[in-house]
Regions:
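Active-site-adjacent structural elements that line small-molecule/cofactor binding pockets in enzymes
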Residues: 1-298
């Protein structure tokens, strides 16, 4: 389940949303890290209040945070939530990193390889000595009682998927449709993991979901709500690969049975986890959408 309260609500709202996701039987609760509350800090609080569900970030931008700093923070969060943390990280976008933050977005694949080469050992509380082009570290952390945390990467292109397969636990996709997942994402990351002698990676697919009797209205709403993603190059490439004009063309929209069937079909193409991004148009659609997701996940 993909949470929205972290950007639109209070920390109490985030806790309540995660608690409801756990009560509804979902395996994971994913908190985005955009311009609202800090996802990792929020999940440390959630982890003390909500006892069982996996807690993940989707995703924390890498460029503003040194890998050793985020490793220390994540070990602390992992200790707070009893080892249920999965860190989702991503490059963010050139417009954010360069225009908003004034940092270089050059050579993103080199950046993520250096980043993961440092973050991986530290995530297991192991010392790391690494010299790369973007990052160099000689460090050991001492977070007593902190369980290791998982790492997934918002990897979309082939080189990012290869780096992720070799150095992380899986990918978390967005704006990536079922045909692209089946024909490109899943086989690319699985082949790279096999070639590297790594375990089969997680493929976590996040997609918009709405149960409705008015499909056209829901598509129109999705086009507005998710409009920005079509203008960001990494997502635009995935939409183009799918032959989609925008997120509305890959959103899971329809009757309850249709939505359940489309979610279940993702598992058949190699998606290991599904993260629903609900966008109901009214309270009845909200209830029906949640029920369909629960049915598909049961």
């Amino acid at each position: 389940m993909f949470g929205g309260s972290i950007n639109e609500g209070t920390i109490d709202d985030v806790v309540a949303e995660a608690r409801q996701a756990e009560a509804d039987g979902f395996a994971s609760y994913w908190a985005p890290n955009i311009f609202g509350h800090d996802a990792l800090t929020a999940l440390a609080i959630v982890g003390r209040e909500v006892p069982r569900i996996e807690l993940g970030t989707s995703v924390v931008p890498t460029y503003p945070r040194h890998p050793s700093a985020i490793a220390q923070q994540c070990l602390t969060v992992s200790a707070a939530c009893g080892g249920r943390l999965t860190l989702g990280i991503g490059l963010s976008h050139k417009v954010v990193i360069e225009n908003m933050l004034g940092m270089s977005y050059a050579k993103p694949v080199r950046h993520i390889r250096d980043y993961l080469s440092i973050l991986g050992p530290l995530s297991r509380n192991e010392p790391v000595s690494y010299r790369g082009e973007d990052y160099s570290t000689n460090l050991a952390l001492n977070a007593k009682g902190a369980p290791p945390f998982g790492i997934v990467v918002a990897a979309l292109g082939p080189q990012m998927l290869k780096a992720t397969a070799e150095l992380a636990d899986g990918t978390l996709t967005w704006c990536t449709g079922p045909n692209t997942l089946a024909d490109f994402t899943v086989p690319t990351i699985n082949a790279a993991a096999e070639a590297a002698g790594r375990p089969a990676p997680r493929v976590i697919a996040a997609l918009p979901v709405c149960v409705t009797s008015d499909t056209e209205a829901a598509k129109g709403r999705a086009a507005k709500v998710f409009e920005i993603y079509g203008s960001l190059p990494s997502y635009r490439a995935m939409l183009d690969r799918e032959g989609a004009a925008g997120a509305e063309d890959i959103a899971i929209i329809g009757s309850q049975d249709e939505v359940v069937d489309r979610i279940l079909a993702l598992a058949a193409i190699g998606v290991t986890d599904f993260a629903a991004v609900e966008f109901p148009g009214n309270p009845d659609e909200a209830v029906a959408t949640r029920e369909a997701i629960k049915q598909a996940m049961s």
